[in-house]
């Protein structure tokens, strides 16, 4: 589980952070130090963090410029790496794009989509207001309203349901935004 707020040690480097997680989550009886280091290096490369491996994570509230720490997108990728180090079959992320600019958010979601595909892993994201470009990376969506499932399936299926319900949807409209606005207006 990757929470919305990054909980990282600011004085550790990226590599030290991932190695610390490896020491905690990978039993020494099954993994030698060299295997843990290899896993850390591989994960840093996969997450696009190899170039900042020796940089301190920093404190986002103190290091507002990235000279003393990582950018928001890099911090989020480190948080994801902390959870991926033990290779879980399912990864849950709460608002992984929160606080990121649109480019960094798209990069995170694209990376997660690639991981899901390449590693045959189930990745579940909660995102309150995903952009259309982010939605292109989703295989399936679960739309909830007041604790009830409104839709579970693809965007195409959601559009079909809306049209069947009598909605006239213009071609340039983001289907998910339309559905969310429709749900919110029917409160």
Protein language model regions, located:
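Hydrophobic anchor residue at the start of the ABC signature
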Residues: 80-81, 108
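ABC ATPase nucleotide-binding domain "signature motif"
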Residues: 49, 55-78, 102
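Catalytic Walker B motif of ABC-type/P-loop ATPase nucleotide-binding domains
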Residues: 91-95
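Conserved ABC ATPase "signature" region
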Residues: 19, 35-55
């Amino acid at each position: 589980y990757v929470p919305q707020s990054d909980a990282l040690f600011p004085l550790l480097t990226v590599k030290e952070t991932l190695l610390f997680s490896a020491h905690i989550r990978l039993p020494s009886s099954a993994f030698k130090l060299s295997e843990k280091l290899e896993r850390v290096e591989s994960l840093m490369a996969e997450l696009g963090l190899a170039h900042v491996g020796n940089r301190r994570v920093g404190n986002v509230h103190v290091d507002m410029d990235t000279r003393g720490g990582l950018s928001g997108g890099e911090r989020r990728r480190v948080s994801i790496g902390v959870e991926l180090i033990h290779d879980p079959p399912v990864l849950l992320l709460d608002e992984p794009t929160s606080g990121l600019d649109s480019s960094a958010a798209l990069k995170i979601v694209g990376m997660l989509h690639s991981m899901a595909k390449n590693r045959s892993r189930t990745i579940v994201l909660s995102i309150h207001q995903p952009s259309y470009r982010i939605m292109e990376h989703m295989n399936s969506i679960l739309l909830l309203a007041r604790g009830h499932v409104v839709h579970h399936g693809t965007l195409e299926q959601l559009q079909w349901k809306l049209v069947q319900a009598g909605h006239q949807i213009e071609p340039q409209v983001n289907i998910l935004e339309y559905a969310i606005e429709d749900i919110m207006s029917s409160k």
